[in-house]
């Protein structure tokens, strides 16, 4: 496919990146530590660590893994923590020691955790004590030999830390009881590591850095094998994209999305650590009052989120009290941002939501809107530098400009494959190195892409293709709607019919009122046949609404 999108690039943005700049993620972070040593790196609950401090602690942790646990190169180490100061220390330490990090959602059920630990073959895990009880339930059935337990208070000094841990454990009772023999505290690991001499491990771009498990929105989670080169490439692609708008050592970034998710890991951790930014870690973004309170403490310049987070924010009166005078960039990804939400965000903050698109298998960034847009575009923008895309029909042939087709991607950010799944890898990546995304998109004559929907979410009503994103976009415009999801359900007359799940913003909303609203905005076959009101909708760890779960629930009724 001709690279039409290059003509639409922002002035000064190069079409290719130089991947040879870095040999590994450890190389990236080492250079940041040297260049921005005394600058604040990570802040959490009022405690700040400089780049030099994080670098020292990460090396201490790497030394513990290397000298005390004696883990061989390539061994898998799981991380089961939310956004706390120990997360970047553990991640950079694991990678520095030549090991492979396995990001694990701390909110996993025992079944989900067991699958991931067994599938990855992890032998060591770093877990925040709040979630150790889940680990205890599955531990005997995994290959885990070493358990390192972190606590929220341990990074805050002896007196303050002890007080914090007492409140968390005894007053708020946020640490369920667990019994795991022979655990080591994170602080002990750091001390024992510091007492030994770390021997640097030479890494290459082809070495595996992460086993990043797909979000489970498409079934059983698979481990995407992401190399140091994959992550470094995506970081450089993004850095090239943002260079006209953001400046080294001067940005303050909110990290509300979990760092164990690839979107936050690459964007929040890699890109902004590489540019010497101050990264404010939000441990529990569901505590919206506390989150907004954190935003009020100091002006931020970058906000990264997903539609559900933006939606929750703009519907809080206290969000308008935040100082947005320094906000330069709001980056949206993970799911489609709805226009109604984007318009409210722009009205309150003064900055548009810049929509990006990616997937775990691409580290994750594939496309992004230019940062100089004036308003939300409704599309996913342009392929980032050194990235090729093709839109194909069901027979694998390229579709004409303006016609919907499945998006395929090729670039240095595309994964090596799925962990221990050669057949799945062969299905996902073709002989030319293009990755199948499973997403339907349309490209215009200037190379701009608009995502239509997931191929698997397509609903066929009386032979007509209906994309649930379009229906959700329309329903979300209604002022009485807070959240919405659309699925297809079996129907004798039409094959499938549309069912919409809605969380009300205004309790007076009725089904009849909403159907009438849809009739005024949609052609007849796109009007939902059934509306179900819910108190909440099922979501993934980053807030993506899980249509698959809603389909399963509808089938079981």
Pin down the residues of each PLM region.
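ANL superfamily adenylate-forming
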Residues: 7, 138-205
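Conserved AMP-binding/adenylation subdomain of ANL enzymes
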Residues: 232-252, 262-301, 316
């Amino acid at each position: 496919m001709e690279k039409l999108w290059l003509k639409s690039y922002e002035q000064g943005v190069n079409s290719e990146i130089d991947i040879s700049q870095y040999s590994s993620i450890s190389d990236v972070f080492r250079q940041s530590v040297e260049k921005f040593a005394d600058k604040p790196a990570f802040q959490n609950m009022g405690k700040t660590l400089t780049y030099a401090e994080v670098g020292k602690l990460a090396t201490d942790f790497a030394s513990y893994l290397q000298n005390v646990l004696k883990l061989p190169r390539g061994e898998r180490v799981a991380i089961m923590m939310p956004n706390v100061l120990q997360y970047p220390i553990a991640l950079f330490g694991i990678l520095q020691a030549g090991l492979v990090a396995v990001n694990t959602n701390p909110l996993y059920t025992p079944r989900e955790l067991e699958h991931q630990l067994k599938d990855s073959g992890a032998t060591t895990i770093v877990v925040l004590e709040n979630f150790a009880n889940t680990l205890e339930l599955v531990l005997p059935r995994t290959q885990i030999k070493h358990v390192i337990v972190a606590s929220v208070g341990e990074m805050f000094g002896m007196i303050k830390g002890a007080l914090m841990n007492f409140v968390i454990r005894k007053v708020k009772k946020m640490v369920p009881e667990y019994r795991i023999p022979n655990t080591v505290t994170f602080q002990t690991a750091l001390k024992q590591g510091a007492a030994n001499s770390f021997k640097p491990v030479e890494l290459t771009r082809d070495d595996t850095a992460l086993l990043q498990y797909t979000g489970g929105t498409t079934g059983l989670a698979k481990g995407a094998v992401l190399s140091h080169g994959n992550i470094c490439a995506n970081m450089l692609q993004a850095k090239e994209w943002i260079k006209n708008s953001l400046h080294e050592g001067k940005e303050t970034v909110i990290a509300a999305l979990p760092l164990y998710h690839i979107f936050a890991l690459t964007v929040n951790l890699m890109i902004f650590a590489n540019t010497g930014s101050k990264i404010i870690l939000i441990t529990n973004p569901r505590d919206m009052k506390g989150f907004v309170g954190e935003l009020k403490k100091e002006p931020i310049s970058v906000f990264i989120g997903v539609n559900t987070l933006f939606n929750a924010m703009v519907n809080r009166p206290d969000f308008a009290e935040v100082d947005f005078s320094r906000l330069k960039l709001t980056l949206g990804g993970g799911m489609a941002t709805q226009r109604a939400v984007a318009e409210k965000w722009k009205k309150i903050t003064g900055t548009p939501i810049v929509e990006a698109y990616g997937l775990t298998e691409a580290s994750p960034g594939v496309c992004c809107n230019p940062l100089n847009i004036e308003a939300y575009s409704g599309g996913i923008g342009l392929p980032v530098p050194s990235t090729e895309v093709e839109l194909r029909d069901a027979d694998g042939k390229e579709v004409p400009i303006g016609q919907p087709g499945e998006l395929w991607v090729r670039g240095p950010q595309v994964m090596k494959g799925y962990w221990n799944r050669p057949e799945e890898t062969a299905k996902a990546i073709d002989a030319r190195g293009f990755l199948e995304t499973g997403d339907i998109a349309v490209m215009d004559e200037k190379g701009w892409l608009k995502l239509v929907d997931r191929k698997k979410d397509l609903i066929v009503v009386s032979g007509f293709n209906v994309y649930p994103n379009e229906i959700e976009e329309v329903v979300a415009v209604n002022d009485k709607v807070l959240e919405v999801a659309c699925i297809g359900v079996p129907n004798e007359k039409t094959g499938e019919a549309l069912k919409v799940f809605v969380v009300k913003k205004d309790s007076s909303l009725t089904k009849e009122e909403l159907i009438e609203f849809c009739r005024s905005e949609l052609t007849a076959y796109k009007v939902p046949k059934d509306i179900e009101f819910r108190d909440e909708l099922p979501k993934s760890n980053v807030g993506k609404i899980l249509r698959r779960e809603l389909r399963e629930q509808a089938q079981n009724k």
